[in-house]
Amino acid sequence: MSLLTEVETYVLSIVPSGPLKAEIAQRLEDVFAGKNTDLEALMEWLKTRPILSPLTKGILGFVFTLTVPSERGLQRRRFVQNALNGNGDPNNMDRAVKLYRKLKREITFHGAKEVALSYSTGALASCMGLIYNRMGTVTTEVAFGLVCATCEHIADSQHRSHRQMVTTTNPLIRHENRMVLASTTAKAMEQMAGSSEQAAEAMEVASQARQMVQAMRTIGTHPSSSAGLKDDLLENLQAYQKRMGVQMQRFK
């Protein structure tokens, strides 16, 4: 896996699924391919994106700044600085300085990532802040190692909370989660249908699923009644995709 592919993988792992994730993936690909060279416009776009947490915006802003060539005197952005200040905790700043000194001795992406993984997310964010504010310099490769270690910490905690939801024994939460997933799947089917010949069929399946979820929410049903709904929908979507020759990539 190339370095930039690895960075894209880690960064996207902390972005919530949805149309915005696909949009961010496209921007990252363009930036890494050297197709997008307007850092100012890119940062303005990032600043106004909904849904993303301040820290995720800060990390993306840091990655864009590292990658897009820019004028020496280009102003640093406040929304990135605020996100990368380690919650204003002086302990995070102390640890960030220690980490920075260690990173100065590293020359490889993997070496930097290994060193960074033993620090907390707050310390890692503060260390990124140091570099972003030009208080310290490391190679781009080492900075990317720091980014990926931070994303791994965030993705780990997201995965833990996701796993808690999936394994929860509370039937009401499981039921609601299945209905939300069914609605999301229906939306994906409608987006993929486009203007193809099978579009009508996909829209029909998606529409039925929506109506069923709406009915379940309106009249209230037994929590176990939604169990088959999401699976049926996913099965229909996969069959439809196979006929269309579409890969199950970004959707998984």
From Swiss-Prot:
Residues 165-252 are annotated as: RNP-binding. It is found in: Virion membrane; Host nucleus. Keywords: Host nucleus, Membrane, RNA-binding, Viral matrix protein, Virion. GO terms for molecular function: RNA binding; structural constituent of virion. The keyword RNA-binding applies. It is a peripheral membrane protein. It comes from the Viruses. One of its GO terms (biological process) is viral budding from plasma membrane. Its main location: virion. Residues 1-164 are annotated as: Membrane-binding. One of its GO terms (cellular component) is virion membrane. Pfam families: Flu_M1, Flu_M1_C. A motif (Nuclear localization signal) lies at residues 101-105. The keyword RNA-binding applies. Belongs to the influenza viruses Matrix protein M1 family. Homodimer and homomultimer. Interacts with NEP. Binds ribonucleocapsid by both interacting with genomic RNA and NP protein. May interact with HA and NA. Cannot bind NP without genomic RNA. Plays critical roles in virus replication, from virus entry and uncoating to assembly and budding of the virus particle. M1 binding to ribonucleocapsids (RNPs) in nucleus seems to inhibit viral transcription. Interaction of viral NEP with M1-RNP is thought to promote nuclear export of the complex, which is targeted to the virion assembly site at the apical plasma membrane in polarized epithelial cells. Interactions with NA and HA may bring M1, a non-raft-associated protein, into lipid rafts. Forms a continuous shell on the inner side of the lipid bilayer in virion, where it binds the RNP. Determines the virion's shape: spherical or filamentous. Clinical isolates of influenza are characterized by the presence of significant proportion of filamentous virions, whereas after multiple passage on eggs or cell culture, virions have only spherical morphology. Filamentous virions are thought to be important to infect neighboring cells, and spherical virions more suited to spread through aerosol between hosts organisms. Most abundant protein in virion. When expressed alone can form virus-like particles in transfected cells. This is Matrix protein 1. It comes from Influenza A virus (strain A/Turkey/Minnesota/501/1978 H6N8). The lineage of its organism: Viruses, Riboviria, Orthornavirae, Negarnaviricota, Polyploviricotina. The gene is M.
